[in-house]
């Protein structure tokens, strides 16, 4: 029998996860929940996704907009084997009691506190840790990207210390209230940014320092990475290792892709839905070794890189596949791999 999946929150992440669920051979989308009858609610109806009211007091708003509802979020959660909470940061914590009341395991997004959950999750790094957990946090877009990078390096060479400067987009394309508009902000000014401690929820013993900047861009995040390894491979060997990973894309120098804008254009030309890039995008010519120090640049698409992770987390919690089986199925159905 297919896994019955509910998605609570049908915005940037939720709509992508819902679409991904419908592509899985072992899953069925029970429905999605929205707080308001906006264009995304209309999209859910057009996609024939059963739509539920996330806030009961707003049912009249949906009716006034001519949008038919399948019920309330309580009914959605009750009908599901597992729920993906894709609500804005902080709302997942408010929803936890709802999921517990229905004894439905829940996945939360990286904006929630690690203290909220039993385990933080990355499919490449700690898939098995989520087995039978009631509350699992799929780490943020940046932490997902760093975990995918650090896992093979740790396994193959050992990591003595990681240092990362994250140049973060100011907001997503649809977040008109975010910024900066004309500024470059240390965010935060003090060390570390939250990303290092977040990586430690996946790799508890890893020595990592992170710094963050926010810039007036919406396309992607960019990471400047320095990792001191416990051995001294050459750059070609490291590049080959990273190229072998299923959710990394080493950008060939010959492609002429010199920034996030061309990466998004590349994704559109390849027919990616919403121009999504699920993979870490690593500039191949940036992969350099100085002694035991590795340097590279990578770009992370903040709207989509966690989508395959959510799909894998569903299987991890319910124990329906091992890590390799799940990632292979997810990658094949979504079309991961450039």
From Swiss-Prot:
Main EC class the enzyme belongs to: oxidoreductase
SMART domains given in the database record: Gp_dh_N
Pfam families on file: Gp_dh_C
EC numbers on record: 1.2.1.59
Residue ranges of coiled coil: none
Residues at which D-glyceraldehyde 3-phosphate binds: 140-142, 195-196
Pathway terms, separated by semicolons: Carbohydrate degradation; glycolysis; pyruvate from D-glyceraldehyde 3-phosphate: step 1/5
Broad class of where this protein is predominantly found: cytoplasm
Entry's Gene Ontology cellular component terms: cytoplasm
InterPro entries, alphabetized: GlycerAld/Erythrose_P_DH, GlycerAld_3-P_DH_AS, GlycerAld_3-P_DH_cat, GlycerAld_3-P_DH_NAD(P)-bd, Glyceraldehyde-3-P_DH_2_arc, NAD(P)-bd_dom_sf
Annotated positions binding NAD(+): 12-13, 111, 169, 302
SUPFAM superfamilies: Glyceraldehyde-3-phosphate dehydrogenase-like, C-terminal domain (SSF55347), NAD(P)-binding Rossmann-fold domains (SSF51735)
Catalytic residues in the record: 141 (nucleophile)
UniProt-annotated location(s): Cytoplasm
Catalytic activity field: D-glyceraldehyde 3-phosphate + phosphate + NADP(+) = (2R)-3-phospho-glyceroyl phosphate + NADPH + H(+); D-glyceraldehyde 3-phosphate + phosphate + NAD(+) = (2R)-3-phospho-glyceroyl phosphate + NADH + H(+)
Keywords: Cytoplasm, Glycolysis, NAD, NADP, Oxidoreductase
HAMAP family, sorted: G3P_dehdrog_arch
Family label: Belongs to the glyceraldehyde-3-phosphate dehydrogenase family.
NCBIfam families: GAPDH-II_archae (TIGR01546), PRK04207.1 (NF003251)
Protein name: Glyceraldehyde-3-phosphate dehydrogenase
Native species: Natronomonas pharaonis (strain ATCC 35678 / DSM 2160 / CIP 103997 / JCM 8858 / NBRC 14720 / NCIMB 2260 / Gabara) (Halobacterium pharaonis)
